[in-house]
A protein has these predicted regions:
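Structural signature of hydrophobic alpha-helical transmembrane segments
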Residues: 1-10, 30-33
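Short aromatic-rich membrane-water interface segments that cap or initiate transmembrane helices
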Residues: 1-6, 125-139
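Hydrophobic cores of alpha-helical transmembrane segments in multi-pass inner/ER membrane proteins
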Residues: 7-20, 63-77, 136-152
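Hydrophobic alpha-helical membrane-insertion segments
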Residues: 19, 92-107
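Membrane-interfacial loop-to-transmembrane alpha-helix junctions, especially the N-terminal start
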Residues: 26-37, 92-98
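Membrane-proximal helix-loop-helix units in multi-pass membrane proteins
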Residues: 36-90
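C-terminal ends of transmembrane alpha-helices
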Residues: 42-52, 103-122
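C-terminal transmembrane-bundle signature of multipass membrane proteins
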Residues: 106-119, 133-162
Length: 165
């Protein structure tokens, strides 16, 4: 569906932004590897229909591999990683990213519960309404995460440009 294509495109952009930052800027490399790896695992999960062509549920193994690969260098350099993560939590973009993740991982799941809709609408339950609200909440969360990633990218580049003068 169009909604899923947009969500997958947004996730791809988020992954690209964080891996680009990790590749170009050593100052926050391990933090960006972790964030990019997390969103890569989420992207793989969103692409589950594609991975089901290989074998049903195979997305799990690809997501696990992506997560493990994203953990290697940050774990090896754990002190730098912790310092970078602490720095990231002090940016305004961290709060926006967390808000987006809450919308995706918590609220969209709550709004997607059939029992909730049956309790609210009783006999007037229509599945399409539940799907629209659930996917809308998820899309909103992805857009918050993309906005946070773009904002972080721009702020990070400006900060480095100022330090180079």
């Amino acid at each position: 569906s169009l909604t899923e294509i947009v969500q997958e495109s947004v996730l791809t952009a988020i992954v690209f932004i964080h891996f680009l930052l990790a590749w170009r800027y050593k100052a926050m490399r391990y933090c960006n590897i972790l964030v990019g790896g997390f969103f890569l695992a989420m992207l793989i999960r969103e692409l589950d229909a594609l991975f089901d062509l290989i074998a049903h549920g195979s997305w799990v193994w690809f997501a696990l591999i992506a997560a493990l690969l994203a953990l290697i260098h940050p774990v090896i350099h754990y002190r730098q990683t912790l310092h970078q993560l602490a720095q990231y939590t002090r940016t305004p973009w961290y709060g926006l990213l967390i808000s987006g993740l809450l919308a995706i991982l918590v609220f969209s799941r709550l709004f997607g519960m059939q029992a909730l809709w049956l309790a609210i609408l009783d006999g007037g339950y229509v599945r399409v309404v539940k799907n629209v609200v659930e996917e809308g909440c998820e899309s909103f969360g992805y857009m918050l995460c993309l906005t946070a990633s773009i904002g972080y990218f721009c702020t990070f580049r400006e900060t480095l440009a100022q330090k180079s003068y």
